[in-house]
Curated annotation (Swiss-Prot):
Keyword Secreted recorded: yes
Species annotation: Homo sapiens (Human)
Source domain of life: Eukaryota
Disulfide bonds, paired cysteine numbers: 30-62, 40-59, 48-80
Gene: SPINK6
The protein, known as: Serine protease inhibitor Kazal-type 6
Residues modified as Pyrrolidone carboxylic acid: 24
Lineage of the species this protein comes from: Eukaryota, Metazoa, Chordata, Craniata, Vertebrata
Signal peptide (from-to): 1-23
Coiled coil stretches, renumbered: none
Alphabetical list of Gene3D superfamilies matching this protein: 3.30.60.30
Length: 80
């Protein structure tokens, strides 16, 4: 019984880890950057877009999404 419980616990931990790893791409909450009056800072926090472009930070990435009409998504955090 202890062995099956340990196996179940390890399986659950592995599932949670892999779910986090594979869900990195895709969605970013850009709500705070929808206003065209909001200007982006020069803070460096790269985002790799599905278009192969590296954006300097979340704000620049979100502005590109708006400009593209939602055609760009997050490929992964960091440089492309």
């Amino acid at each position: 019984m202890k062995l099956s419980g340990m196996f179940l616990l390890l399986s659950l931990a592995l599932f949670c880890f892999l779910t986090g790893v594979f869900s990195q791409g895709g969605q970013v909450d850009c709500g705070e950057f929808q206003d065209p009056k909001v200007y982006c800072t020069r803070e460096s926090n790269p985002h790799c877009g599905s278009d192969g472009q590296t954006y300097g930070n979340k704000c620049a990435f979100c502005k590109a999404i708006v400009k593209s009409g939602g055609k760009i998504s997050l490929k992964h955090p960091g440089k492309c």
